[in-house]
Structures are given as C-alpha cells and as structure tokens.
Amino acid sequence: NWLRKRKKRDDIIIATKVVGIGNKTVREGKPINEHTIEEALTKSLKRLNTDYIDLYQLHWPNRGSYHFRQNWAYNPSNQNTKKIKQDIFDILNFLSKKVKEGKIRNIGLSNETAWGTMQFIKIANENNFDHVVSIQNEYSLLCRFYDTDLAEVSHNENISLLSYSPLAAGLLSGKYQDGKVPEKSRL
C-alpha cells in the first residue's frame, strides 16, 4: 500500500465522504445516520490503511438537494423541519464522538445549501459539537449558486469551499460544441 510504504501519514491530508440518498448505488441510497457513517467510516479506514481521516464529508443532505443540475426539480416545501434538525443533531453528535475517538479530524459537507449549512453551525454551537470546516459544492462559470447562496456563510462562519466540476461536467471544455456529444461522455 502506497500510504503505508511512505510512513509519513501526518504529511498527507486524506478526505473522503459518506454518501446518502443522492446515490442509490451505495448502500441502496440509505440516508446518512450513525449506522451508515459507522459502516462507511470503518470501510474507508480499512481501505485507505489509516487510522484517521483528516476530512470526513457528508455527501448529499438526507432531505435532498438542488445541486448537480437538480435545481429545476428541487422542492423543499414538504420538508419536516423538526425531523431535519433532529437528523442533523444525531449526525453531528455521532461525528463529534468519532472526532473525540481520533477517527475523524474534521467534518465537511457536500452538496449542501446555505440553510442546511447554517443548521449544522447552529446545532453544533448549541450542543458543543465539532464544527463543519468545509463545503464541497459544484462551482463553475455556469453554476454560480455558491456566490449567491453560500459565499456569505463561508466568509462569516469560516467554512472553506472545495469546488467540484469547474468545467461544468465538460460543458466548458468545448467537447460538446455544435450539438456533438462524444461517445461515452457524461452528458
């Protein structure tokens, strides 16, 4: 294993994610909770041959998300706010225990909204849980939600953006010009 051979684990930053409802191919799309976190974290630690993860991210909120070009269909009007806040409490409580155990160093979010991010911050503050340090959301010239949705939260709450899809899934690369769709492309 590359990591073990180097013998310099502290010189490397490892980030990984636990995926929830956004991906049906992993744990059948079960929501993120203490059981799915425990399962995913244990497997990640074993697979990566390490005893801790520097940044452990929650990939896709359990309540859904408008990210990855789902903004036209996203409708939060049927969300149960009390259930969502309890869900965030349970997740942060469990992740904070994993931080205390030394298995996780930092907590991050992925494909989260400004409201969701603020709930993580508020609940962490109210309960002395570990704080979210980063958010990994889509960001490109074609997808600027971060600028109008999260930049202010990130600045004032000291949460770093780890952007993904800077070429908008290839749309900005030029390979889809003139209506052409290359074979085996993502779109």
How does the language model describe each region?
Residues 13-17, 55-58, 162-166:
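Non-cysteine beta-strand/loop elements that form the S-adenosyl-L-methionine
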Residues 30, 58-59:
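Specific alpha-helical transmembrane segments that line the substrate/conduction pathway
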Residues 9-12, 51-55, 105-106, 130-134:
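Short acidic capping loops at alpha-helix termini that bridge into adjacent secondary structure
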Residues 10-23, 135-139:
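A short, structured active-site edge motif that brings together acidic residues
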Residues 22-38, 77-86:
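Active-site mouth loops of central-metabolism enzymes
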Residues 61-187:
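Beta/alpha (TIM)-barrel catalytic core signal, keyed to glycine-rich beta->alpha loops juxtaposed to Asp/Glu
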Residues 1-18, 31-38, 42, 51, ...:
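N-terminal binding-site loop/beta-alpha segment at the start of enzyme catalytic domains
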